[in-house]
Each structure stands twice: as structure tokens, then as C-alpha cells.
């Protein structure tokens, strides 16, 4: 089995989602010739050389990352049922999330984090994380959410988004980077701290 590094996993998925939605927001005229009834073009997509996330420029130079990006862009462009569902949910919920991110001072790109975590659905993970932002019970209570047998505010989009913002701001203050803040949302602040110390790294991109 090929070794999968931390850097190959969560944040790579985040980049792929950002790039995929950017491509799919383009006009469908790139794939349909309206002058020729019934026409539909299937074509390879060019891979961007860099992506900007939360004001930080990310260079796409690693061969493995480029190959995975290429695969996911093609899948999400031509697997239209899945893409349409993602875009419909994004159209419905992103404005609500964007407003709160702006009020809390968190970059708008973090709306994609909720999409990755839950597909913008109130789901429950095998570990017990719940809601759009997949918040654990202890974390929710730590950040002021009411979580008990009768009420679970992790399912409240507004309240859970504000909790996610508080967490991300705290992580940004701790690590000095929105990229590391995003990575810590999945791995935990202590987990990222241990990785940075163990590998004597200062940035997300130096992690193996």
C-alpha cells in the first residue's frame, strides 16, 4: 500500500473542491455547441498552476497533486448529477455562511470547508461529529453550543458556523497561517502542532 501523507489527504481535497467549483461555475458553452443540436463536447481540462486560498497562493507543482487534481476536475465536471447537487446546495447555503464568515473576519474561502466536511448536509460522522461543520460534542460545548439530550445546536447553521469561525481564528492566531488553520480543523490544533514539531517544519507545505 502506498504511503499516504497527511498533506496528500485533507487539504488536497479542499484545493480540489475549490478548483472543481471554479471550473463548474463557468458557462456550459465550453462543453455545448448551441448551433449544433444534441452536441456535447468531452475535453481535457487544463490544470491551474496555482490556486489562491484565503489570500495565500498555493503552487501546484507536485506530480501526485496534479494527477489527483486532474482526476477530480474531470470527475466533477462530467459527473453532472453530483456536481449539480453540490452547486444547488452551495447556491442555497453559501450566502448564509458567507455573511457569517464576513462578520467574524474569516476568509470567504472557508465556506468550502463546510462543503468538504458534510456536503452541506446535517450529517453525523462515525466519530459522532454533527452538522454542516462536523463539530464534536466536547468542542461544541467548549465554544458555547448547547448540546444535550433535548437540544443540539450543532445542527444550527448560524451557530455552528460561528463556532467554526472562532476555532479557525484561534488556530490562525496559534499557527500564523490560514492554511494551517484549515488543516487543523481536520487534524486538531494539537495534532498539527505535533506534526510541525516532529518534522521541524514551519509551514503546511513542508509537512510530509
Question: Which functions belong to the PLM regions below?
Answer:
Residues 62-208:
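Catalytic glycan-binding domains that act on GlcNAc-containing polysaccharides
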Residues 1-105:
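An acidic, Gly/Ser/Thr/Pro-rich helix-cap/linker signature
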Amino acid at each position: 500500500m502506498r504511503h499516504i501523507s497527511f498533506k496528500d489527504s485533507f487539504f488536497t481535497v479542499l484545493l480540489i473542491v475549490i478548483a472543481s467549483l471554479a471550473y463548474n461555475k463557468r458557462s456550459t458553452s465550453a462543453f455545448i455547441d448551441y448551433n449544433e443540436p444534441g452536441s456535447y463536447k468531452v475535453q481535457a481540462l487544463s490544470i491551474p498552476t496555482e490556486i489562491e486560498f484565503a489570500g495565500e497562493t498555493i503552487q501546484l507543482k507536485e506530480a501526485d497533486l496534479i494527477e489527483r487534481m486532474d482526476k477530480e476536475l474531470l470527475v466533477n465536471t462530467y459527473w453532472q448529477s453530483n456536481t449539480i447537487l453540490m452547486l444547488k446546495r452551495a447556491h442555497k447555503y453559501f450566502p448564509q455562511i458567507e455573511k457569517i464568515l464576513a462578520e467574524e473576519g474569516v476568509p470567504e474561502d472557508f465556506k468550502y470547508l463546510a462543503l468538504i466536511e458534510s456536503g452541506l448536509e446535517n450529517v453525523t460522522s462515525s466519530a459522532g461529529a454533527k452538522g454542516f461543520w462536523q463539530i464534536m460534542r466536547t468542542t461544541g460545548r467548549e465554544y458555547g453550543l448547547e448540546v444535550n439530550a433535548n437540544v443540539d445546536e450543532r445542527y444550527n447553521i448560524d451557530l455552528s458556523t460561528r463556532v467554526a469561525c472562532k476555532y479557525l481564528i484561534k488556530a490562525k492566531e496559534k499557527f500564523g497561517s490560514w492554511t494551517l488553520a484549515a488543516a487543523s480543523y481536520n487534524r486538531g490544533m494539537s495534532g498539527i502542532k505535533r506534526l510541525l514539531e516532529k518534522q521541524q517544519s514551519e509551514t503546511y507545505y513542508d509537512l510530509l
